Amino acid sequence: GKTRFVQETLADDYFSGGERNLVIACEEGVEEYEDELLQKTNTTLVVLEDKSEFNEMFLAECQKKYKPTQIIVEYNCMWGLDYLREMYMPKGWFVAQVITTVDATTFDVYLKNMKSLFMEMAKDSDLIIFNRSTDETPAATYKRNMRAVNPKAQVVFEKEDGSQLEFEEEM
């Protein structure tokens, strides 16, 4: 999911070449970051266990200690985006892009049980990636749901192997 996406982004020379990267992971995921990749891409990983740790003082300490030129926040959506939006960022820090990753195999369940939380996440996204998509994924329906919330977002469907799912869009 998110961790794999971040690792693929870091592995891209266009993104991380010559930069001092900082990844702030706001939850332990299923997948772990590869130490070799972190070293190769000049990336420091900081993992937080609790929302209370993610605050303005923490961000200021990260700026002072690591002096990053690029920051990726692997955010825990359960904390709510307003929490992040309202936080004072260190000088030079800004949100360049909001990317939301969605597990296509569990999207229906999330939508039924946590619709408002998910829609809040999607409304500010520049890019929404449905990963773990298959030929059975109702991609046109999912894309229509996302367009209703955020017509400006780019919506893509990615298969397990990283290739994009091709599908017919409904009119």
Language-model features and meaning:
Residues 73-157:
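Phosphate/Mg2+-binding loops and adjacent switch elements
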Residues 1, 121-124, 169-171:
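Unusually extended, aromatic-enriched hydrophobic runs near protein termini
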